[in-house]
UniProtKB/Swiss-Prot annotation:
GO terms for molecular function: ATP-dependent peptidase activity; ATPase binding; serine-type endopeptidase activity. It comes from Bacillus licheniformis (strain ATCC 14580 / DSM 13 / JCM 2505 / CCUG 7422 / NBRC 12200 / NCIMB 9375 / NCTC 10341 / NRRL NRS-1264 / Gibson 46). Keywords: Cytoplasm, Hydrolase, Protease, Serine protease. SUPFAM superfamilies: ClpP/crotonase. CDD domains: S14_ClpP_2. Cleaves peptides in various proteins in a process that requires ATP hydrolysis. Has a chymotrypsin-like activity. Plays a major role in the degradation of misfolded proteins. ClpXP1 is involved in the complete degradation of the Site-2 clipped anti-sigma-W factor RsiW. This results in the release of SigW and the transcription activation of the genes under the control of the sigma-W factor. This is ATP-dependent Clp protease proteolytic subunit 1. It is an enzyme of class 3 (hydrolase).
Amino acid sequence: MNLIPTVIEQTNRGERAYDIYSRLLKDRIIMLGSAIDDNVANSIVSQLLFLEAEDPEKDISIYINSPGGSITAGMAIYDTMQFIKPQVSTICTGMAASMGAFLLAAGEKGKRYALPNSEVMIHQPLGGAQGQATEIEIAAKRILSLRDKLNKILAERTGQPLEVIERDTDRDNFKTAEEAKEYGLIDKVLTRNIDAQK
């Protein structure tokens, strides 16, 4: 059962009920709290574009608690974050793994955060193939190409040499919030909401 809380707000016209995500969107906060698939990506991309249209100068925050998911869906979010004019701040709550970690690092440099007990996990892309040998070969070449692309972007986003990223993403690599900061995946560990403004 997926229960979405409702928030009642007083306005000069009376009361207005919002689902919690719509209310947060009014404050330019987007929640990424699930595995990343095409539906989730379309929702996040739509929210980013909507907030840019509302105010292209004001920052947007994405709160991430995600095990990762589809590379192509994640890249749609990543490309939109880079494409829009507002700066996008990212905040890890709980876990940012795989594509979730990639999107966490994709936030505006200086505005990438994690809460103290959150974890970040990086690794190489996962995939599988079946069918004729030529189809398996095509799939293998594609996933190796995706791995190279993701590693190059992570190297640029973290400031780590490409060889370090390649080594560290060879297997699941879990980091505490503080370790993620030292590695360059985030810029600051937040203990209170006001820390982000400093």
